Amino acid sequence: MKRNLITILSAICLLLVVRCAEKRQQPVLTNKDVSKVIARMTDVMVHDVTNPPLASRFFAYTCLAGYEVMARDKQLKSMQGILNQYPAISASKQNELYNPQLSAVMAMFETAAKLQPSGSLMGKYEEGFLDSCRTIGFTDEVIDSSKSYAKFISKKILAYAKADGYRKISNYPRYKLKRTPGSWDLTPPAYMVPVEPYFNTVRTLVIDSASQFVPDAPVPFSTDKNSAFYKFLELSYSKSGDKLTQEEKNIANFWDCNPFAVQNDGHMLIGLKKISPGAHWMGVTAIACSQSQAGFAKTIEVNTMVAIGLMDAFICCWEDKYRTDRIRPETAIRRYIDPHWKPLLQTPPFPEYISGHSVISTTSAVILTHYFGNSFKYIDDVEQQFGVPPRQFNSFTQAATEAAISRFWGGIHFMDAIDNGILQGYRVGNWVVNKVSRGKGSK
C-alpha cells in the first residue's frame, strides 16, 4: 500500500515537472511580432484611406489591448488610475497554458479587426501569424487558451473605446464653412469636405482635455501689405517652386504623409497610396525597438505610449484647427497674390492652424527620446515601399524638427503654425511621459 502511494505521488510529481517544463519551454515572441501588427494595421489604413486623427485612435486602442494583457501578467504597470476613465478590468480565469506574449499579439489583432472598416483583413493577417506560431512550436492548446484570453481583454478595451464619444460625431450637424475673408476654404484638386471637425470632442487618454495646451493665437488675418500676416503670405510665396533647393523638396516629399493625396488623370482624380503621419511615427517606433533589441514587453509599452501621445496630440491639434479656422496658404496666395500659384504638396482638407505634423511629430519624439535617449541614430525607411527614399537622423528631435519645417517648404503651413505646433507637441509629449511615470498604476 505504501509503495503504491509512493508510486502515485511520484507520477503526479513527474507530471507536474513535465507540465512546468512545457510552460517554461514555450517559444518566445519578439519586438518584430508587435511591429508586424502595427504594419498590417497601416496597410489596412492605406486601403481604407483612414484619416490621420482616426488612425491615431485605432493605434491607441489596439496597443492598449496588448498592453493590458502584459500588465495583467505583472510585466507592465497598470493603466488604471493613469488613463482617463480607464475601467477596472475584472479577473478572467485563463487556462494554465495561456501565453501572455501570444495573447497580447492576438488581443491587438482582435481589437484592430473590430475597429478598422476593413478589419476582416486583420483576421487574415492573424491567421498567417498563428501559422507561424505553430511552426515555431506553439501547440493548438496554448493558442486556443491564449486566444480566448485575448478576446476577453479585447472586448473590455473595445468597450472603453466605444465610450470615448467618437461614435456620437456622426449625429452632429454637418460642418459649415464660415466664408469670411480669413477663414478656411476647400482646396484643389479634390475640394474635399473638412476632415473630422468634431474630433476635439473625443475623450482624451492622458491629458485633461482638448484645450489643456492652447497655443498662442495665430497672427491675425490681414490684406494690409504691411501686416504680419501679409509678410507670412509673401514668405510662403517666395519660398516655393524653383526657389526651393532640391534637398528642401526631398524633405517636404519625405514627410508628406497625406492619405488624401490625389492626381489628375484627364477628367478623373486618382487616389495616391500614402500613410498617415501617425503611421509614419509608429513605423519609426518599430525601427527604434528593432535597432535597440527591445524586449517584447518594452516594445508593447513604447508602442502604446507613442500611440497614446498621437491620439491626445491630434485631439489638441484638431481643437485648435477648427477653433481658429485659419485660411491655408494656397487659398490666400491665389486670392491675394497669384491666382495660378500651386504649393509643392497638396493641401490637406482641414484648417491651417496649428500644424499637425509639428504637434504629433514633436510629441512622438519626446516619448521616443524618453525610452531611447536623445542621441539615437537611425535610418528611416518607413515609406520605402511607397517609393520614398530613406533618410538618416541623429535623433528623434532632429527628425521631428525636419517634419515640422517640411510643411513650410511644402507650401501648406505658415511659420507661426509650425513654431507653435512644436511647442504644443513638447507639452503633450512631456505630459504623457510624466503622467505615466508617476502614475498610480502598479507594476
Model-based region annotation:
Residues 1-28:
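Bacterial Sec-dependent N-terminal signal peptides
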